[in-house]
Swiss-Prot record:
It is found in: Cytoplasm. InterPro entries: Arg_repress (IPR001669), Arg_repress_C (IPR020899), Arg_repress_C_sf (IPR036251), Arg_repress_DNA-bd (IPR020900), WH-like_DNA-bd_sf (IPR036388), WH_DNA-bd_sf (IPR036390). The gene is argR. Its main location: cytoplasm. Regulates arginine biosynthesis genes. Belongs to the ArgR family. This is Arginine repressor. GO terms for molecular function: arginine binding; DNA binding; DNA-binding transcription factor activity.
Amino acid sequence: MRSSAKQEELVKAFKALLKEEKFSSQGEIVQALQEEGFENINQSKVSRMLTKFGAVRTRNAKMEMVYCLPAELGVPTTSSPLKNLVLDIDYNDAVVVIHTSPGAAQLIARLLDSLGKAEGILGSIAGDDTIFTTPARGFTVKDLHDAILVLFEQEL
C-alpha cells in the first residue's frame, strides 16, 4: 500500500476512534490503533495528530474526560475547497450575512473584498465565523446575495 494511502487510512481510523468519545488517554488511542493494524503508531505520533486535527478533551455523556473532534472545530485541510468553509448565506434589507466554519470568516471576507465593486461588493466585515457584506451602489442586497451563492455554489 502506498504511504499516502496508508496515511489516509490512519487518519480515517484515528477520526473514527475519536468520534466514539471513549478514549481518555493517548495510550488508549495508540492501543486501539495498533489493534486496527497500525503497528508503527506511537504516543508522539498520536499527540501530533491530536494537535493537527484540533482534538480537545471534554466530558462525554458518562462524564468521563475523553478526546474528541468537535465537528464545528474541524480544521480544514489543504485539499478543502473554500466553499466547504461557508456554512450559510442569508440577507436582509441591508447586508448579506455569511456564516463560516470557525476561523474562516476573515479568509472568505478577503476573497469577497478582492472581487470589489465591479462584482457588487462595497465591503465586508469579518469576525471569527460571521461576515457582513454590503452591496456597492447600483446593486441590491438580493443581487449580492445571489452572486455570493453562485460564487460558493450554494442552493438558491
